[in-house]
A protein has these predicted regions:
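Hydrophobic, membrane-interfacing alpha helices
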Residues: 1-272
Length: 272
């Protein structure tokens, strides 16, 4: 059995409430990794050959950086509002200013997905790109960012797992008193491996091995994430405000429509 290593969530105190936190650096790393992977993605088909009416390339690093800015806004705003709405609505209703305390942790993937989808839909319309094409482009670049976020969760000592058999070699006692001082699954690491590394490997191989039909890559991301998050949630401590509903956690219920819609869309686009 292991004990969670102590890492101060604050890397550097600046002045007053201002500080550099590991959680914030995890998000910065996520965006840097996206930028690096997007450079490689430009070499994949059909993006490498697409042209504008004047013969200039449609997909360029300038377009990617513009897209990334819109995506960052969508992820941060959607992720934070999603966490407040899905997991702790009453708390943030009575403490609305705490919605702004993003660096203290508390982001929702499902909220971030909705936020970035809306932001990139608007970006695609404004810049003259096909929405499905945009989502196919970004999908393989996303899981490494999810992996970075889970490392941030681990350092913060949040979102720990359910009680585990103390004889499990990697069972861990988390330092947060709310964790009860008992052996638990390090569910952040499970999610790092499943939603991060495994999903990245699957999507990058699928997207780069040959040209795919429009919508195939994006829908596989929705399906793959839904399945892997659903599985990982089995080991994660249910949210205190939700508990289990019909045996499923809040995260699992949010994954159910992703799995259904993702499978339906992937099957549709694959046969198109």
């Amino acid at each position: 059995m292991l004990t969670q290593p102590y890492i101060d969530p604050v890397l550097l105190h600046i002045a007053g409430p201002f500080a550099i936190r590991w959680y914030g650096l995890a998000y910065l790393l996520a965006f840097v990794l996206f930028w690096l992977l997007a450079r490689k993605r430009l070499q994949h088909q059909p993006f490498a050959r697409l042209k504008r009416s004047d013969g200039s390339p449609l997909w360029t690093m300038q377009a990617v950086e513009d897209l990334l800015f819109w995506g960052v806004v969508g992820v941060v705003v959607g992720g934070r509002l999603g966490f407040c709405l899905f997991y702790q609505p009453m708390h943030f209703l009575t403490h609305p200013l705490e919605i702004l305390y993003v660096m203290d942790g508390g982001m929702s993937f499902h909220g971030g997905l909705l936020g970035v989808t809306l932001a990139l839909f608007l970006w695609a319309r404004k810049r003259g790109f096909g929405f499905l094409q945009v989502m196919d482009f970004i999908a393989p670049c996303v899981p490494t960012g999810l992996a970075s976020g889970r490392i941030g969760n681990f350092i913060n000592g949040e979102l720990w797992g359910r009680a585990a058999d103390p004889s499990l070699p990697w069972a861990m006692v988390f330092r947060d008193p709310a964790a009860g001082g008992i052996a638990r699954h390090p569910s952040q690491i499970y999610q790092f491996l499943l939603e991060g590394l495994l999903l990245f490997g699957l999507l990058w191989w699928f997207a780069s091995s040959k040209e795919r039909k429009p919508g195939e890559v994006a829908s596989l991301f929705v399906l793959g994430y839904g399945l892997m998050r659903f599985a990982a949630e089995h080991f994660r401590e249910p949210d205190a405000n939700w508990g289990l509903v019909l045996g499923l956690s809040a995260g699992q219920w949010l994954c159910v429509p992703m799995i259904i819609v993702g499978f339906a869309l992937w099957n549709h686009f694959r046969k198109a």
